[in-house]
Amino acid sequence: MLELKKREVKVSEKQIETKGRKWAVDHGWYCRKFTSPAHRSVPDRLFLKDGIVVFIEFKKPGNVPTKAQWEEILEIRSKGGRADWTDSVERMIEILEGRHEEWHPPS
């Protein structure tokens, strides 16, 4: 008997970021790629809606931010900003809607 194997679908960081951006724009968020020439490791995207600014670092499923990326996220938080990271569109939606638990770097 022929056995069929499930094809593992690999999702890239770019695919998550693209789908997430589309969802955000469709739901009224101003969304821009975020870069800072003098600083490496800043979050990938800036989102703005109703006076709320959120920075999000995107990762492919199963990956986590680097130490430098964590430092940037924590720096933004220390100044009262909202910053987090995601490895899925679903989590990005939770972050933007403010119904998530902040993730913290491993101890």
Give residue ranges: language-model regions.
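Catalytic phosphate/metal-binding cores of nucleic-acid and nucleotide-processing enzymes, i.e., regions
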Residues: M1-S107
